[in-house]
Amino acid sequence: MFKAIVSADTLQETLDSVSVLVDECKIHLDDDTLSIRAVDPASVGMVDLDLAATAFESYEADGGLIGVNLSRLEDIAGMADAGQLIQLELDEETRKLHIQIDGLEYTLALIDPDSIRQEPDIPDLDLPAHVAIEGRDIDRAVTAADMVSDHIALGVDTGDDLFYVNAEGDTDDVHLELAPDQLIDLDAGDAHSLFSLDYLKDMNKAIPTTAEVELELGDEFPIKLHFDIADAQGHVTYMLAPRIQSN
Amino acid sequence: MFKAIVSADTLQETLDSVSVLVDECKIHLDDDTLSIRAVDPASVGMVDLDLAATAFESYEADGGLIGVNLSRLEDIAGMADAGQLIQLELDEETRKLHIQIDGLEYTLALIDPDSIRQEPDIPDLDLPAHVAIEGRDIDRAVTAADMVSDHIALGVDTGDDLFYVNAEGDTDDVHLELAPDQLIDLDAGDAHSLFSLDYLKDMNKAIPTTAEVELELGDEFPIKLHFDIADAQGHVTYMLAPRIQSN
Amino acid sequence: MFKAIVSADTLQETLDSVSVLVDECKIHLDDDTLSIRAVDPASVGMVDLDLAATAFESYEADGGLIGVNLSRLEDIAGMADAGQLIQLELDEETRKLHIQIDGLEYTLALIDPDSIRQEPDIPDLDLPAHVAIEGRDIDRAVTAADMVSDHIALGVDTGDDLFYVNAEGDTDDVHLELAPDQLIDLDAGDAHSLFSLDYLKDMNKAIPTTAEVELELGDEFPIKLHFDIADAQGHVTYMLAPRIQSN
């Protein structure tokens, strides 16, 4: 059983966070939380999303699992105006999701969850460096790095106590250093890893410029990015595997 | 003889209503009205437009007929700012239309009216159901239906006293029901017809979201859509032939 | 030695004025002025730009010459917000330009000036007609002319004391006449020349609609267009060679 009412903004934010990595996903409909875990086809980027029942206008669920086509669901949500409410109701028998927006009813055929790529186990890493940074600074770094290279190094300099971004191209380079007073928080630790810019650009699309983003970093380790959605009633974690550094 | 001054907005609205169906048209320049009738190449959609002399800043005509390339005339009108006035003057000898916008003069070669597809006779049908609906509700229905199908059913349910829209796709469906309190007016009568979404999408482009649109519907009959333009100094009627239903 | 701080707006305006004609250019870094002269590959359009040291927040230079890729430098400047300051510093040894925007450092490899097309000598012509006109009127004339033709005639009618623009297409024509009261200034003299619209469209892109543009015109002679940038701390001159008229 699943029946919920949610604002168009919240639904769009939720779907966008996942659709930057995958086209289809499984959605867990537990009694107090809607949750999604997914990994991209190359197993390089992962997403773990939780949206509390309190993020909804109303929410009733009892532990179901549905498979959805994300871009289709995004298109439907995109028909609603910003403040409008969207009603969702699962028909268990037909395995269809009834979506209502101000009298307009869309009947969406669901996907068999077994046909969707398996959900990843997102490892509980104990990474030495923690950085809290504004979404707009991630956007600036990723946009600039993309002008010169297809990969980007993120690290923490424990000596000078700063977070840095480096991108080295064939002729041009991009470098950004942020000291503690330019960050929301810095818990320095030895960290330097290289990442594919394609993935970070996709993740960056889903990060609001005003969001406070927590980064967890290590030395040639995956990076984790955490941020809130839906007025902190929802939470997204991205994990991105490092690229092997050639020196 | 034809000489007129009209606001850029009014001219654009007029041209757009016709250009969604045809590339070229004949314009009748009668002494108190400018009028256009046209049918698309497949004879599926028709338009009948009247613009009263009172919609113009000034208007002098004596029953002439000109043939124009609509997209060309739209491009010219598009050079004017929203509030600007456009002067039109026909040179009978050269068969050219002189168009002036704030000192800029564009000389447009006209098309021989005889070379343009014949104007349709728009039949005076006595259709059983009449619905008055906001332009934005037509827009919502057409946009949603377009996500699942290439045709759309419009009808009136006399039992439940409501207007409905149905679009059935291979996997997903769209359904919209509007009761009298969600409509401007409903004069129920037996009606259900299937239409090509391509045509309705084109017509929808020319219908302002704030317009009050009168629909006339029947059972496997053409639909007529009426709405005002130019502050009710002009009027547009679209007629769209039904598709044969396969059951 | 070169070290300067400049607003993003001023830098963008400067680069745009030159990039409409060429992809790479030499920049002269004199002690009180930054200047650029360039000619397009076909030697039809030329630009001569001066930006005074006073247009910068701070400026130190001693007569250097650098070669730059304009679109790359425009992309970098485009990362800054409208009001933001951009720091430029030349590393003489590595021949790289260090560009800083709010902590983000971009290291741009310069181009050997000797590998860039030679700078033109812009002739000091004594043209008989001078017209001062708003940028928006140039924009209107060029946009309209582009609808009918690929060349445009500009001239002054000394008899009627007006500046005119003519474009003749295969079927349609565009004509604009501006009398002294519709111009900022008119110093009439015999002038009529035909120009390639492609070049004038490119130059028009860099002319602000609110700019006061000085035109110098002659009879089958090049045209010169002058306008200020950077709150009159900078100045741009375009020169465009005429096309041969076929009569």
From Swiss-Prot, chains A, B, C:
Gene3D superfamilies assigned to the protein according to its UniProt record, in alphabetical order: 3.70.10.10
Alphabetical UniProt keywords: DNA replication, DNA-binding
Gene Ontology biological-process entries: leading strand elongation; regulation of DNA replication
GO MF entries: DNA binding; DNA polymerase processivity factor activity
Summary of subunit composition and partner proteins: Homotrimer. The subunits circularize to form a toroid; DNA passes through its center. Replication factor C (RFC) is required to load the toroid on the DNA.
Purpose: Sliding clamp subunit that acts as a moving platform for DNA processing. Responsible for tethering the catalytic subunit of DNA polymerase and other proteins to DNA during high-speed replication.
Assigned protein family: Belongs to the PCNA family.
UniProt name for this protein: DNA polymerase sliding clamp
